[in-house]
């Protein structure tokens, strides 16, 4: 036994590794598990494909195709973004809008956002977490998000604002 060596448990190692995965997926468009493994290795975290696959599953990560229909990127539903109303939520929302917004339309007090199939719930969650003062709430289907504007804003004005956040 070596004295002075720090003792790590599988639990802390897994938690630390998963926290780093969340950080990477929140800031970088990762298109494959091998790309993610390389980014982790760059941070000194060596991981097998089986472990990485298990981590992604435990984190609830999914691979979503972007608005351009190109290669999908991994996203984590609750990716450690700031809690509602805390600065930084709109930066994450802007990134997601740029990746997922296909089109925006409006009716009355609703902005109607189109996404690639399977991405609407994820985008709606990001809008909710951004805690925009002019948004009452969201409803998501498979590829459509209804965003309700807070009066006196109209759906058309809200759609324009959300499109402008799309960097």
Swiss-Prot record:
Pfam families named among the record's database cross-references: Arg_repressor (PF01316), Arg_repressor_C (PF02863)
One of the GO biological process terms: L-arginine biosynthetic process
Pathway noted in the entry: Amino-acid biosynthesis; L-arginine biosynthesis [regulation]
Single GO term (MF): arginine binding
Keywords on record: Amino-acid biosynthesis, Arginine biosynthesis, Cytoplasm, DNA-binding, Repressor, Transcription, Transcription regulation
GO cellular component terms, A-Z: cytoplasm
Places the protein is found: Cytoplasm
Keyword Amino-acid biosynthesis attributed: yes
Superkingdom of the source species: Bacteria
Family recorded in the similarity comment: Belongs to the ArgR family.
Protein function: Regulates arginine biosynthesis genes.
Protein name as annotated: Arginine repressor
Gene source species: Mycobacterium leprae (strain TN)
């Amino acid at each position: 036994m070596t004295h002075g060596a720090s003792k790590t448990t599988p639990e802390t190692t897994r938690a630390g590794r998963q926290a780093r995965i969340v950080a990477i997926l929140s800031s970088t468009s990762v298109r494959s598990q091998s790309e993610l493994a390389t980014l982790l290795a760059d941070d000194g975290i060596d991981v097998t494909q089986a472990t990485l696959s298990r981590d992604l599953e435990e984190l609830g990560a999914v691979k979503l195709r972007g608005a351009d229909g190109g290669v999908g990127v991994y996203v984590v539903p609750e990716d450690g973004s700031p809690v509602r109303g805390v600065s930084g939520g709109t930066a994450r929302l802007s990134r997601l809008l740029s990746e997922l917004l296909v089109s925006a339309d409006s009716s009355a007090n609703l902005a109607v956002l189109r996404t690639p199939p399977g991405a609407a719930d994820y985008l709606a969650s990001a809008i909710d977490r951004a805690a925009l003062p002019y948004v009452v709430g969201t409803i998501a289907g498979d590829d459509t998000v209804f965003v309700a504007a807070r009066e006196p804003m109209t759906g058309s004005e809200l759609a324009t604002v959300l499109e402008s956040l799309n960097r």
